[in-house]
Amino acid sequence: MSREDNKETVRYFISEILEKGDMSKLRMVCAPNYINRMTGQGVGSLYEFNRVINKAIPDMHFKIESLVAEGDQVVVRYTLTGTYTGMVPGYQPTGKPVLIRGITYYRLENGLIVEHDPAATPDIWEVLGIKLAVTRLL
């Protein structure tokens, strides 16, 4: 696939799956061996993460600031905005605005996303006031 094709796949992934939460399109852009470095292995972990986040921030919007591709790799710089109005199990919504700036690395194979490695400031869980336990596997 060309760099432009890869960029378009990532753009589609952000707008249709992450922003709109249309998980029915997930397998159209993610390979069976997809891994998300934040949520865990496989599309199932992304599905669950997206379900929670789209419920918590129903008006979520991604503004792509820049999109750079080199070979099979695409890097996106974005701003995520919205309002924390929906329930997250065990936490009450604050009604506060959400503003997150992030950079995400994507790697594609044969036009499908195989690796998704997001980094954001502040972290999405921090914005929602959710404390996560850190577990170290030995």
Regions found by a protein language model. Name each.
Residues M1-L138:
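C-terminal and inter-domain tail/linker signature
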